[in-house]
Amino acid sequence: MSIQNTFPSYQSLTLALNQQAVALTAAEMHGLISGLLCGGSRDAGWQSLVYDLTNEGVAFPQALSLPLQQLHEITRETLEDDDFMFQLMMPEGETVSVFDRADALSGWVNHFLLGLGMMQPKLAQVKDEVGEAIDDLRNIAQLGYEEDEDQEELEHSLEEVVEYVRMAAILCHTEFTRRKPTAPENAKPTLH
């Protein structure tokens, strides 16, 4: 399965969002949906949360809800894939500047943290490797750049940060969605 062939395109999703007057970019919407999934969302309740957070609780018309359902499904599948197929939805192409990509990454991370926080209200209490990754994501969301920075150097740095964010999202998904042992599984074996 080719992820690119099944993902709605960045441009088509941006257009659908704009047509419905939703004030999010495709990157931000993907970040939000990814955050909900990585936080443990497993049912259709994700749609209500998206409506509440982006459209004053009003459901989207089919012209937007269908691409979002497709985006949700593909994102869920890639997060659950053992081959780490998950990718961030970012603008690409010759006409997209490194500054546009940096802004999109910041928006993606901010909305990822929003979605994650909606599903994991005690996010600030998470420790160890996952807690460090979440702290790093908070810092990445606030990163800025100077317009006169070397674009080639910034592009290289951005690629590294995108890869880190991708792996941090996968780590969060693993942490918050893995099956927790039930009480009988925790019980010590009984000697007879």
Curated annotation (Swiss-Prot):
GO terms for cellular component: cytosol. It comes from the Bacteria. Pfam families: UPF0149. Coiled coil: none annotated. Gene3D superfamilies: YgfB uncharacterised protein family UPF0149, PF03695 (1.20.120.740). PANTHER family: UPF0149 PROTEIN YGFB. Belongs to the UPF0149 family. HAMAP family: UPF0149. This is UPF0149 protein Spro_3920. It comes from Serratia proteamaculans (strain 568).
